[in-house]
Design a protein with these regions (language model features):
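C-terminal beta-rich recognition modules with glycine/proline-rich loops and embedded aromatic residues
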Residues: 1-28, 59, 79-232
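Non-cytosolic beta-sheet module surface loops
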Residues: 9, 23-25, 38-41, 68
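Residues at beta-strand starts and edge strands
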Residues: 15-17, 31-33, 74
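Beta-strand residues in well-ordered beta-sheet regions across diverse protein folds
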Residues: 20, 38, 49, 67, ...
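Beta-strand-rich binding/interaction modules
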Residues: 29-50
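Solvent-exposed, conformationally flexible loop/turn segments
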Residues: 30, 61, 71-73
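C-terminal beta-strand-rich structural cap/linker in extracellular carbohydrate-active enzymes
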Residues: 34-36, 66-81, 87
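Solvent-exposed beta-strand/loop surfaces of large extracellular or lumenal domains
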Residues: 43-68, 86-91
Length: 232
C-alpha cells in the first residue's frame, strides 16, 4: 500500500496547512497507518481537525501523531496560530517576529546597474547593482509598545491573498505589520550605511515624533532595518 499526501498551504505566511489523503493504487480505499506532523517551536497551541472535526493530538517532543484508519479523500487541517512577538538581540535591540518569519522595515528601493572596471570583469562579471532608498529609516520602538501585553493591540497584521506571483519581494509581500515607532534624531547615515547607535537607552531623550511604520518579511527586502533600537 502506497499512500499519497497532497499538501495545500500558504505557509510560512498563513497559519493553515491542509493535507489530503490518497492512495497510489485505485483499488485501495482505506488503510491504517500513523501520520506525524512537527509543531514549530514558536507555536504555543496547535489546532488539528480531521474532516472538519477537532481531534486531540498528543504532542510528544513537539510532534503530533495521528493514527487511525484513513479513507481516500480524508483531510487533516493543521492550524498554527501566528502571534506577533518581539525578541531582544545585540545591545538590547528589538526584532519583530510572527510565526516562523522575522520582519524588517519596508523601504522603497532604488536599483541602479553599474559596470565593473574592465580589469575586474573576469572575476566579478560585467556589472553589479547598487540599492539605495530615499525613505527614512532611523526609527526606534518604545519599550512599552514591544511588551508582550501590548503586541497584539499595537502591531496590526495585514494578510493578503498570495496568488501565483512570486511572494519574496516588496511588491508581492503577502503579510505586512503596521506598528508605532519613534524617530531617532541622532541616528544618521555613515559611509553609505546606518551609523552607530545606542540600541538601548533608558533615558530616550534622542527621540522625535511618533509615527506608524510598515514591516514586511525579511526575505522580501534587500535594504533592511531589522534590529530596532529601544527607548523608554
Amino acid at each position: 500500500m502506497e499512500a499519497v499526501l497532497r499538501q495545500e498551504t500558504g505557509y510560512p505566511f498563513e497559519e493553515t496547512v491542509t493535507v489530503t489523503v490518497d492512495f497510489a493504487h485505485k483499488r485501495v480505499r482505506k488503510a491504517s497507518f500513523p501520520l506525524y506532523f512537527r509543531v514549530p517551536q514558536w507555536c504555543s497551541q496547535a489546532q488539528v481537525l480531521v474532516n472538519g472535526e477537532a481531534v486531540e493530538a498528543p504532542a510528544d517532543n513537539r510532534v503530533l501523531r495521528l493514527e487511525r484508519e484513513w479513507s481516500r479523500g480524508d483531510q487533516v487541517t493543521l492550524r498554527f496560530p501566528m502571534e506577533v512577538r518581539s525578541s531582544r538581540w545585540y545591545g538590547g535591540s528589538a526584532v519583530i517576529e510572527r510565526g516562523p518569519l522575522v520582519y524588517a522595515l519596508k523601504m522603497e528601493e532604488k536599483w541602479e546597474k553599474k559596470a565593473f572596471e574592465p580589469e575586474r570583469q573576469d572575476q566579478y562579471g560585467p556589472y553589479y547593482h547598487t540599492v539605495t532608498t530615499d525613505d527614512p529609516w532611523n526609527y526606534a520602538f518604545r519599550l512599552k509598545d514591544i511588551g508582550k501585553e501590548n503586541l497584539a493591540s499595537g502591531f496590526k497584521v495585514e494578510v493578503k491573498e498570495i496568488g501565483d506571483a512570486y511572494p519574496w519581494n516588496l511588491e508581492n509581500a503577502p503579510v505586512s505589520i503596521k506598528a508605532k515607532a519613534v524617530v531617532l534624531r541622532n541616528w544618521e547615515e555613515y559611509n553609505g550605511s546606518t551609523g552607530p547607535v545606542a540600541y538601548y537607552n533608558e533615558v530616550g531623550g534622542d527621540t522625535g515624533d511618533e509615527v506608524w511604520i510598515e514591516l514586511v518579511p525579511y526575505g522580501c527586502t534587500t535594504l533592511r532595518i531589522t534590529e530596532f533600537p529601544v527607548r523608554r
